[in-house]
Regions:
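Juxta-kinase regulatory segment immediately upstream of eukaryotic protein kinase catalytic domains
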Residues: 2-111
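ATP-binding glycine-rich loop module of kinase domains
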Residues: 119-149
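Conserved kinase catalytic-core helix
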Residues: 151-166, 185-226, 242-267
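Short beta-strand micro-motifs within the conserved protein kinase catalytic domain, predominantly
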Residues: 167-177
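Conserved catalytic-loop position in the HRD/HxD motif
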Residues: 265, 270, 282
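Active-site Asp-x-Gly
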Residues: 274-316
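ATP/Mg2+ or Mg2+-diphosphate-binding catalytic cores
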Residues: 311-312, 337-364
């Protein structure tokens, strides 16, 4: 068992419980034990199929494999789980679920978050028949516990957007970290292309809190964020950051920029659609006063990075005054965030670096 998988199991069951004998649940490890991403319960096919909703790969091959495995599960054969392990019952977690929901025989699936010092464990909580009751987030590291706490605070300030954002069922200290139990959002995975439903949701979001900021203030704020990580980067990265800030300053220093509440990680995999309405979850990166448009920038860049396409195929930043400067600041801020949270995320970091260099070269 890898160290990451062991840590997730310990967090789930409790370190002491995980090492004791007693009832154990079998989980399939996807895509493999060497590269664990999701743990799906094996047994009752209804709970297994519901757990597969938790596993949402976007790569074509992984989606095909998921579809094939779901068809096998429907036959009732459990031999499909080639990579599996047995995990002790999470007694503390079961007691919490019973207290909050009344369900005394919950079934669980687990999702390991992105690698890095903010890595979290997300646990899908279901009834034995497969109905999802909610999701538990647990910080695996101390910094990730702070992020879970941040998400709880954000959700408690977004009650006006319910039921299109999760509701906090429970939040509090747990196993020297922090735990958030939130309600599920319903629907199918959201589309990978920006549409009217995305804009409608973002307009409702920004209506919660809106303020105007001098453009130069935004440049200084992003500069401070960048400097927190730039000192440990190669001098070429430092030069790229300095050039980006100088270019953005020239674009924005005489402008006033509307800002408001932003999701911070607005992307297809954090959305669901039902009856033509968008629901959004995973709010740990929420910001009170981000420039309007940063969520749409992020959505487009994340999709373009995943599909290895140019972000320029999605929208034109020359469409309005200051848009290019704001895009430069978004890229630098996003690059700083990725370097801080996932320094080994080569593709995401490299995509943003190349996008910055390309945009700066276009204006030189």
């Amino acid at each position: 068992m890898t160290a990451v998988l062991q840590e997730a199991v310990d967090r789930f069951a409790g370190r002491r419980t995980a090492q004791e004998y007693g009832p154990r649940q079998r989980f399939a490890v996807l895509p493999s034990r060497r590269e664990p991403r999701c743990l799906i319960p094996v047994g009752d096919s209804r709970a297994t199929l519901e757990g597969f909703r938790f596993y949402t790969p976007y790569a074509f091959g992984a989606r095909v494999l998921k579809g094939l495995l779901k068809q096998i599960v429907k036959t009732g054969w459990n031999g499909w789980a080639l990579d599996s392990l047995y995990v002790a019952e999470p007694l503390g977690l079961k007691a919490l679920v019973a207290s909050v929901t009344g369900e005394r025989r919950p079934v669980f699936a687990m999702l390991l978050g992105a690698p890095g010092r903010y890595r979290k464990l997300t646990i899908q909580v279901m009834r034995p028949g497969g109905q999802t009751l909610g999701y538990v987030k647990l910080g695996i590291t101390k910094p990730s516990g702070s992020r879970v706490h941040q998400e709880a605070r954000v959700l408690e300030s977004l009650t006006a957007l319910q039921p299109f954002v999760p509701r906090v069922l429970y939040a509090g200290e747990w196993q020297d970290s922090y735990l958030l139990f939130q309600s599920p959002v319903e629907g199918r995975p959201g589309p990978v292309k920006l549409s009217g439903m995305h804009i409608d949701f973002l307009e409702k979001l920004v209506a919660i809190h809106r303020v105007n900021k001098p453009g130069i203030q935004l440049v200084e704020e992003v500069g401070m964020r960048w400097n927190e990580v730039a000192w440990r980067c190669h001098w070429r990265w430092q030069a790229l950051g300095a050039a980006t800030l100088a270019e953005a300053r020239g674009e924005l220093e005489h402008l006033t920029i509307p800002c408001g509440f932003a999701h911070g990680d607005f992307a297809p995999w954090n959305t669901r659609v039902q009856d033509g309405r968008l629901s959004v979850f995973d709010w740990e990166s929420g910001e009170w006063e981000a420039p309007l448009g940063w969520d749409t920038f992020h959505f487009s860049v994340q999709v373009a990075s995943l599909l290895k396409k140019s972000w320029r195929a999605t929208f034109d930043v020359a469409a309005s005054p200051g848009a290019r400067g704001l895009f430069l600041l978004y890229l630098l801020s996003s690059l700083a965030k990725t370097l801080d949270e996932q320094p080994d995320s080569y593709e995401g970091i490299e995509y943003r670096r190349l996008a910055l260099e390309t945009e700066l070269a276009l204006n030189s």
